[in-house]
């Protein structure tokens, strides 16, 4: 079984983990309702790009 030859330092470990942070979701303002929603998703009222996808 492979065993590390040297202990990984805190600096080396943290440098490796710099890209693991969370990113905020891409929100855009809906032109019809004015609400914020995620891009490329159906709005809460069931429309997408001005067309009704889901009728309530």
UniProtKB/Swiss-Prot annotation:
Instruction: Give a single Pfam family match.
Output: Ribosomal_L32p
SUPFAM superfamilies according to UniProt:
Zn-binding ribosomal proteins
Q: For this chain's UniProt record, which GO biological process terms are given? A: translation
Q: Which InterPro entries match?
A: Ribosomal_bL32, Ribosomal_bL32_bact, Ribosomal_zn-bd
GO CC terms in record: large ribosomal subunit
Q: Which keywords are on file for this protein?
A: Ribonucleoprotein, Ribosomal protein
Q: Does the keyword Ribosomal protein apply?
A: yes
Its Gene Ontology molecular function terms?
Answer: structural constituent of ribosome
Start and end residues of each stretch annotated as Disordered: 1-56
Q: Where is the composition biased (Basic and acidic residues)?
A: 29-38
> What segments bear the compositional bias annotation Basic residues?
7-20
The record's similarity note reads: Belongs to the bacterial ribosomal protein bL32 family.
Which PANTHER family does the entry link to? 50S RIBOSOMAL PROTEIN L32, LARGE RIBOSOMAL SUBUNIT PROTEIN BL32
Instruction: Write the protein's name.
Output: Large ribosomal subunit protein bL32A
What is the native source organism of this protein? Listeria welshimeri serovar 6b (strain ATCC 35897 / DSM 20650 / CCUG 15529 / CIP 8149 / NCTC 11857 / SLCC 5334 / V8)
